[in-house]
């Protein structure tokens, strides 16, 4: 039978030794290359939105880096969960891609102020859940515009910089900053 597994470092190899709890059967016709990418992006995102972010139907989800691998997964999983999805990316072309896979709204953070645009799109409320695989200089303005009791999911640092957030914002917003490390979660809680 064709199977795939999350194997951590070396997990994209053609052969690997992994815990049986991390192995899953592949549907017929599902290519191994696709399976390797699928497991990493969609499992990370499902864990982030369901387990860590507790995204609920009717809530607003802001996805940063929305045209990337985990970003596109977040748009699709967010829609399946019943969220209103706002996709933030660095170009209009990437925004069009995000709309084509289900995003309700888009923000081009290269040409507009993401904080102002998010407030505009949410009637001043902000996003209930922020999915952030980007980090860098977007983190603080986005966190400043998060909804009351919002959940800010730290998924990665694609921009390179690890942001420093003023923790008084978490207090003032009643918000949570939640780390997402699916690989470690899968290892510890298979």
Question: Across the structure, where does each feature detected by a protein language model lie?
Answer:
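Short amphipathic alpha-helix with an adjacent loop that forms part of the alpha/beta core around
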Residues: 113-124
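Short glycine-centered segments of the SAM/dcSAM-binding site in methyltransferase folds
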Residues: 2, 60, 84, 150-151, ...
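Glycine-rich phosphate-binding loop and adjacent beta-alpha segment
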Residues: 137-190
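Mid-domain Rossmann-like dinucleotide-binding core that forms the NAD(H)/NADP(H) cofactor-binding site
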Residues: 36-112
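Glycine-rich phosphate/adenylate-binding loop and adjacent beta-alpha elements
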Residues: 1-28, 32, 39
């Amino acid at each position: 039978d064709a199977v795939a597994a999350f194997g951590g470092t070396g997990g994209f190899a053609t052969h690997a030794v992994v815990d049986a709890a991390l192995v899953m059967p592949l549907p017929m016709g599902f290519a191994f290359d696709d399976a390797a990418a699928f497991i990493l992006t969609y499992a990370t995102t499902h864990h982030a939105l369901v387990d860590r972010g507790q995204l609920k139907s009717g809530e607003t989800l802001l996805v940063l880096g929305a045209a990337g691998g985990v970003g596109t997964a977040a748009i699709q999983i967010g829609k399946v969960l019943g969220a209103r999805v706002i996709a933030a990316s660095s170009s209009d072309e990437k925004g069009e891609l995000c709309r084509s896979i289900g995003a309700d709204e888009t923000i081009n953070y290269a040409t507009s102020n993401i904080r102002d645009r998010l407030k505009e799109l949410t009637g001043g409320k902000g996003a209930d859940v922020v999915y952030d695989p980007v980090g860098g200089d977007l983190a603080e303005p986005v966190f400043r515009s998060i909804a009351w009791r919002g959940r800010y999911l730290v998924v990665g640092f694609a921009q390179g910089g690890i942001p420093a957030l003023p923790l008084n914002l978490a207090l003032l917003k009643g918000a949570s900053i939640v780390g997402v490390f699916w690989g470690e979660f899968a290892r510890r809680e298979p």
